[in-house]
């Protein structure tokens, strides 16, 4: 039987994607402290938050700490790859959850794989899986969409393209945009589509609000705070009227209102194009 690989057994010149807590530091995987302590380089989305994490975990490290976030990811990737090729162990951490999942990391992983560098992970907490588990919605098949586009037209097109998706959908959203996102989902998917707003998962003020999208829009009108993950039930075959005459009538109705970028207009146009 093979022994489990510990940090000391992992060869140098390896990229370690380390999952960090999404709320409570007690949820940190035991291996996280070991990997941080033994790293040659730690690439962190926010070096200040990394320092706090090291303190909370009681970890002392002699690693070289570098920032690695969306704004410098392209420039820093070659630097970190050079360190990996020189035989250093690079540990990548983001503010919360797993690197690469709606967080920095993909470019470095792709570059490391291309260069033949070993890539491994310290599995950790995931807001996506946690939200799915507590949502009360089907989790046998799901689709993670990350953050919706900020521009209204792009956001409407994204939701229109997902209107007929039968898998459960998971989104990240900023608290100040949650009400608008729910309203646009209600328009694109139907106000009776079931969903769950998962807020501050694993933290002191954790809250999961479940119900039809229309009800959740009304709930969010009072304001939403904290980290938000949205889980939306997938479409049922009967939920989307694909009768060509009905779709053309809906398109004409939207054209008369000049709302040519509305989710409803785009949904109907997309469905007609598939006919």
Name what the model sees in each region.
Residues 67-74, 148-149:
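Conserved helicase motor
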Residues 2-70:
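Glycine-rich, flexible N-terminal cofactor/catalytic loop recognition
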Residues 2-14, 126-254:
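Beta-strand/loop-alpha-helix module characteristic of Rossmann-like adenine-cofactor folds
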Residues 255-275:
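Single conserved hydrophobic/aromatic residue that forms the stacking wall/gate
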Residues 45, 68, 93-95, 120-122, ...:
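Structural motif
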Residues 85-149:
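Short glycine-cluster motifs
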Residues 36-42, 116-120, 168-169:
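Short active-site oxyanion
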Residues 7-8, 77-85, 161:
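Short amphipathic alpha-helix with an adjacent loop that forms part of the alpha/beta core around
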């Amino acid at each position: 039987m093979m022994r489990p690989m510990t940090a000391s057994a992992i060869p140098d010149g390896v990229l370690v994607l380390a999952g960090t807590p999404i709320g409570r530091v007690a949820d940190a995987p035991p291996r996280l402290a070991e990997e941080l302590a033994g790293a040659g380089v730690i690439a962190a989305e926010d070096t200040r938050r990394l320092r706090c994490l090291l303190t909370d975990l009681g970890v002392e490290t002699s690693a070289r700490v570098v920032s690695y976030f969306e704004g410098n990811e392209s420039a820093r990737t070659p630097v970190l790859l050079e360190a990996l090729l020189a035989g250093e162990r690079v540990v990548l951490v983001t503010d919360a959850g797993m690197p690469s999942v709606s967080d920095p990391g993909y470019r470095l992983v792709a570059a490391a794989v291309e260069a033949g560098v070993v890539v491994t992970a310290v599995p950790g907490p995931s807001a996506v899986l946690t939200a799915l588990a507590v949502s009360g919605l089907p989790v046998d098949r799901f689709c993670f969409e990350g953050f919706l586009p900020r521009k209204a037209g792009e956001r409407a097109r994204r939701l229109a393209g997902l209107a007929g998706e039968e898998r459960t959908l998971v989104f990240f959203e900023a608290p100040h945009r949650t009400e608008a996102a729910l309203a646009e989902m209600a328009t694109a998917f139907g106000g009776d589509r079931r969903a769950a707003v998962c807020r501050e998962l694993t933290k002191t003020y954790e809250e999961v609000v479940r119900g039809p999208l229309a009800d959740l829009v009304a709930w969010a009108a009072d304001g939403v705070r904290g980290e938000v993950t949205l889980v939306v039930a997938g479409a049922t075959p009967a939920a989307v009227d694909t009768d060509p005459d009905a779709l053309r009538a809906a398109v004409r109705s939207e054209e008369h209102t000049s709302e040519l970028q509305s989710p409803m207009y785009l949904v109907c146009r997309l469905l007609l194009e598939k006919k």
